[in-house]
Amino acid sequence: MSDNLNMTAPGAGTGYSGDIFDRLLRERIIFLGSQVDDEIANKLCAQILLLSAEDPTRDISLYINSPGGSVTAGMAIYDTMKYSPCDIATYGMGLAASMGQFLLSGGTPGKRYALPHARIMMHQPSAGVGGTAADIAIQAEQFAQTKREMAKLIAEHTGQTFEQVTKDSDRDRWFTAEQAKEYGLVDHVITLAEGPISN
């Protein structure tokens, strides 16, 4: 994705000023198309903040095709989504796993979509631990707190109980688009007959 977040008018005769993601950004469409890490999180947060400042009344569309990644980086994106005055419509396509699933279900209620062949996977967060025994104990407590916090938020977004989410995310839990809708991870499954997706 381009580091250039310039929102200038398209170049004459081209329809856009270069990078396809810049053109999509002008249409208020942003992509999470990779593993979630700090660099990607910073870019997505900046794009959400930019679009929110530009017009706080229009929706932002976030397309997700991600295997997941860093919990802290994902939480930065999630908190920015919630901080934005704009509705954030989320679209799961390809794979929305782990933190990808979390962000998909964290979209604005009623505006969370899955494409028909998307696969969604929910599981508990994972983390490597190391260091002294005291460090490991501290990290384990932080990990347990993060696990509880994420299960609580997923329960709020899906309408499932905290206990059910905790049980279901104990191991990898895979969903088709329709199963994700039934569970409450998304609100709609987009069919090809509905035509193009736009704001």
UniProtKB/Swiss-Prot annotation:
GO biological process: protein quality control for misfolded or incompletely synthesized proteins
Keywords on record: Cytoplasm, Hydrolase, Protease, Serine protease
Name of a matching Pfam family: CLP_protease
Cellular compartments annotated: Cytoplasm
SUPFAM superfamilies: ClpP/crotonase
InterPro entries in alphabetical order: ClpP, ClpP/crotonase-like_dom_sf, ClpP/TepA, ClpP_His_AS
Gene3D superfamilies given in the database record: 2-enoyl-CoA Hydratase, Chain A, domain 1
Top-level taxon of the source organism: Bacteria
GO cellular component, one term: endopeptidase Clp complex
Catalytically driven reaction(s): Hydrolysis of proteins to small peptides in the presence of ATP and magnesium. alpha-casein is the usual test substrate. In the absence of ATP, only oligopeptides shorter than five residues are hydrolyzed (such as succinyl-Leu-Tyr-|-NHMec, and Leu-Tyr-Leu-|-Tyr-Trp, in which cleavage of the -Tyr-|-Leu- and -Tyr-|-Trp bonds also occurs)
CDD domains assigned to the protein according to its UniProt record, in alphabetical order: S14_ClpP_2
A Gene Ontology molecular function term of the record: ATP-dependent peptidase activity
Active site per UniProt: 98 (nucleophile), 123
Functional summary from the UniProt entry: Cleaves peptides in various proteins in a process that requires ATP hydrolysis. Has a chymotrypsin-like activity. Plays a major role in the degradation of misfolded proteins.
Oligomer and partners: Fourteen ClpP subunits assemble into 2 heptameric rings which stack back to back to give a disk-like structure with a central cavity, resembling the structure of eukaryotic proteasomes.
Similarity comment: Belongs to the peptidase S14 family.
NCBIfam families assigned to the protein according to its UniProt record, in alphabetical order: PRK00277.1 (NF001368), PRK12553.1 (NF009205)
Protein name according to UniProt: ATP-dependent Clp protease proteolytic subunit 2
Originating organism: Corynebacterium efficiens (strain DSM 44549 / YS-314 / AJ 12310 / JCM 11189 / NBRC 100395)
Phylogenetic lineage: Bacteria, Bacillati, Actinomycetota, Actinomycetes, Mycobacteriales
Gene that specifies this protein: clpP2
